[in-house]
């Protein structure tokens, strides 16, 4: 006779992951030698990377992004999604958010020539396909990157506003706002900032709602080219 034995497993009722601490660790450990070209590869190949990881069962995978190597925990593989990730560990989602913040910090402090270099190299596919460009503001543009919602204060609530707008337009299910609604804002728990920062969220939503949203399959480079002939898309 076969005996099947089962034991109760204590549920993880609260997360100890702190995006601010994790981001500081990321900058300290992983940004030496990091270039805008490496970040460009990560974002323009984002869908391909995600698809590749979803097909591999390995828990830890090293990504080689044009020579910059970074190891991530593969939560994209269905069988790995419930695996606990260390607080200082990187996932594809965390890495995306960290790089978005890294770029914003650069944009806010570097020289104008370097800003132009960043804008020429970094393309946000999720923003571009909705007709949103760098001209709409760096905070807005970078807020379209997954993971930016970890830093609602840094990005001035734009990641949340983008999500709310998409839900209002029936372009996204409300359930996808859950992760954003669990985030802190400048140290404030969600239960606090959802009450005290309502005006700020509404202001961010006003900005997002006024953007020139339009679905397009034309690349940013193609739009710039056509604009020279008086064709705006």
From Swiss-Prot:
Pfam families for the chain: Bunya_nucleocap
The organism's place on the tree of life at top rank: Viruses
Cell compartment(s), UniProt: Virion
UniProt keyword list: Capsid protein, Eukaryotic host gene expression shutoff by virus, Eukaryotic host translation shutoff by virus, Helical capsid protein, Host gene expression shutoff by virus, Host-virus interaction, Ribonucleoprotein, RNA-binding, Viral nucleoprotein, Virion
Any one GO MF annotation of this record: RNA binding
One GO-annotated biological process of the protein: symbiont-mediated suppression of host gene expression
Chain sites annotated for binding RNA: 14-15, 18, 47, 50, 75, 81, 94, 123, 125, 128, 166, 176, 182-184, 217
GO cellular component terms listed in the entry, alphabetical order: helical viral capsid; ribonucleoprotein complex; viral nucleocapsid
The protein's assembly and partners: Homotetramer. Binds the viral genomic RNA. Interacts with host PABP1.
Protein family per UniProt: Belongs to the orthobunyavirus nucleocapsid protein family.
Recorded domain comment: The N-terminus and C-terminus are involved in homooligomerization and play an essential role in viral RNA synthesis.
Chain's role: Encapsidates the genome protecting it from nucleases. The encapsidated genomic RNA is termed the nucleocapsid (NC) and serves as template for transcription and replication. The NC have a helical organization. Seems to participate in the nuclear relocalization of host PABP1, thereby inhibiting host cellular translation.
Protein name (Swiss-Prot/TrEMBL): Nucleoprotein
Gene for this chain: N
């Amino acid at each position: 006779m076969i005996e099947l034995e089962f034991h109760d497993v204590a549920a993880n009722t609260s997360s100890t992951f702190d995006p601010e601490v994790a981001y500081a660790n990321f900058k300290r450990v992983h940004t030496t030698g990091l270039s805008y070209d490496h970040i460009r590869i990560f974002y323009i190949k984002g869908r391909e990377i995600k698809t590749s990881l979803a097909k591999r069962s390995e828990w830890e995978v090293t990504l080689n992004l044009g020579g910059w190597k970074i190891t991530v925990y593969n939560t994209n593989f269905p069988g790995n999604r419930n695996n606990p990730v260390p607080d200082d560990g990187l996932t594809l989602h965390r890495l995306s958010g960290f790089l978005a913040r890294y770029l914003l910090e650069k944009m806010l402090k570097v020289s104008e020539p370097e800003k132009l270099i960043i804008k020429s190299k970094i393309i946000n596919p999720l923003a571009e396909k909705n007709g949103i460009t760098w001209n709409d503001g760096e905070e807005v543009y970078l807020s379209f990157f997954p993971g930016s919602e970890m830093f609602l204060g840094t990005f001035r609530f734009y990641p949340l506003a983008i999500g709310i707008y998409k839900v209002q337009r029936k372009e996204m299910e409300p359930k996808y706002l859950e992760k954003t609604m669990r985030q802190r804002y400048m140290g404030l728990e969600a239960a606090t900032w959802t009450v005290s920062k309502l005006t700020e969220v509404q202001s961010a939503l006003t900005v997002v709602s006024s953007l020139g949203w339009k679905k397009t399959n034309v690349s940013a480079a193609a739009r710039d080219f056509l604009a020279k002939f008086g064709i705006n898309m």
